[in-house]
């Protein structure tokens, strides 16, 4: 088995621990994945998220810096690093990261919510209100998109059932 395969296995073990909120073992597995594959950006991002859940924002920031160093267009890494900066009281850096994440992905509702929360905490109520409006708008769009996708699937399913029923009728 190659190092990449082993790294992937360790990553999957780590994510299973993350889902079960076992962040210590999660971090151990993800660290092993990173040793096996130092360019495994998703392992760094996931380990950073686990550090964030353990309230270790400095370690989280270090991992998110690695991800951003590997891929400066990773909106999620900027968002998560912004959350970590906010936990350390570095609110200007947090806002910068939230803004950068939104430059990269303008429909990233979670970032609008995070930025709204921080702006509200800082007394920037107009900006916070504007961001909450965006969260609401994006939520409505997502619900509509989901509904449309579900309707398309249902229409296709009904067409398949119709063809199947026609085939059965022809066989009789």
Predicted regions and their residues:
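Alpha-helical tetratricopeptide repeat
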Residues: 1-172
